[in-house]
Design a protein with these regions (language model features):
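Rossmann-like NAD(P)-binding element
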Residues: 56-117
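Hydrophobic/aromatic beta-strand patches that form the interior of the parallel beta-sheet core
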Residues: 34, 76, 91, 141-143, ...
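Structural/interface elements that position substrates and couple domains in central-metabolism enzymes
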Residues: 34, 51, 66, 194-202, ...
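Rossmann-fold dinucleotide-binding core
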Residues: 42, 117-186, 191-194
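NAD(P)-dependent Rossmann-like dehydrogenase/reductase catalytic/cofactor-binding core
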Residues: 2-3, 29, 176-181, 186, ...
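NAD(P)+-binding Rossmann beta1-loop-alpha1 motif at the extreme N-terminus of oxidoreductases
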Residues: 1-56, 60, 70, 111
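ATP-dependent carboxylate/acyl-activation modules
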Residues: 2-17, 22-32, 133, 146, ...
Length: 286
């Protein structure tokens, strides 16, 4: 396996919100990046998302134009998984579906170099189960970025049953090379972040459904009373109600009925009101 100083090329599988964000911060840190998705349109959308994000950083004087242009030039977009043949570290950021992730990791195992570290950005699914799809489970690790990736400082490193200690060290060092701070979690449902965050959001929705207070007062009470930047409804809309539901259902499946998703959360998702990305969630957006 490579030391972090030996990593030159980073692969990113998935060009959506998370994948494009990961590609952006890796390229900004100086890595060559290969960003792959299944359709050319998705790759183009991801690249446009990165360009827009870099432009915003330049407009805020958080990044100079030369560095922004250089970062974008370091990113190769592709639909060909074989383009990852020279990747030293790959981060998978596809949909939170175990069978899809296992298929991706089986394919990555076949096309990437033997030394490559294979990481998943999963927020709730088992690293150990994902790793079982490969012949190198000791080189599979969770590197869970927070959304939005270019803005959030934290990265959760998740250790599977067979993850080698050296791979864990590489995961921490890689995240730190992106100017992130890390914490470590064992391969238990939800890890640290979503084991605590998703029940918090879910309980907020339950409180609304049971008439404890309005959503505005629940959000206001949590922000003023506990000094968090967003209340549960604002945060749920930001994350995506479908993502919250999927994560909460995973916790329920693994840990029991105390994590059952609130009825109102399920109803919102069924109606297609997923938050900011659809223009409507618990709040309305332009």
């Amino acid at each position: 396996m490579p030391a972090v100083d030996d990593i030159e090329t980073v692969g990113v599988v998935g060009a959506g919100t998370m994948g494009s964000g990961i590609a952006q911060v890796a390229a900004t840190a100086g890595y060559g990046v290969v960003m792959r998705d299944v359709e050319a349109e998705l790759v183009a959308d991801g690249r446009e998302r990165i360009a827009d994000s870099l432009d915003r950083l330049v407009s805020k004087d958080a990044l100079d134009r030369e560095s922004a242009d250089a970062a974008l030039d370091r990113i190769e977009g592709t639909t060909d998984l074989a383009a990852l043949a020279d990747a030293d570290l790959v981060v998978e950021a596809v949909v939170e579906d175990m069978s899809i992730k296992q298929d991706v990791f089986a394919d990555l195992d076949a096309v990437t170099p033997d030394h490559a570290v294979l990481a998943t950005n999963t927020s709730t699914l088992s690293i150990t189960t994902i790793a079982a799809a490969t012949d190198r489970p000791d080189q599979v690790v969770g590197i869970h970025f927070m959304n939005p990736v270019p803005v959030m400082d934290g990265v959760e490193v998740v250790v599977g049953e067979k993850t080698a200690p050296g791979v864990v060290e590489v995961a921490h060092a890689f995240a730190e090379s992106l100017d992130k701070e890390t914490w470590e979690a064992d391969d238990k449902p939800g890890f640290v972040s979503n084991r605590i965050l998703m029940p918090w959001i879910n309980e907020g929705v339950r409180a609304l459904d049971e008439g404890v207070a309005t959503k505005d007062d629940i959000d206001r009470g949590m922000k003023l009373g506990t000094n968090v930047p967003m209340g549960p409804f604002e945060l749920a809309d930001h994350v995506g109600l479908d993502v919250c539901l999927d994560a909460t259902e995973t916790l329920q499946e693994e840990l029991g009925e105390r994590f059952r998703p609130a009825y109102l959360l399920k109803r919102k998702v069924e109606a297609g009101d997923l938050g900011k990305k659809t223009g409507t969630g618990f709040y309305e957006y332009d």
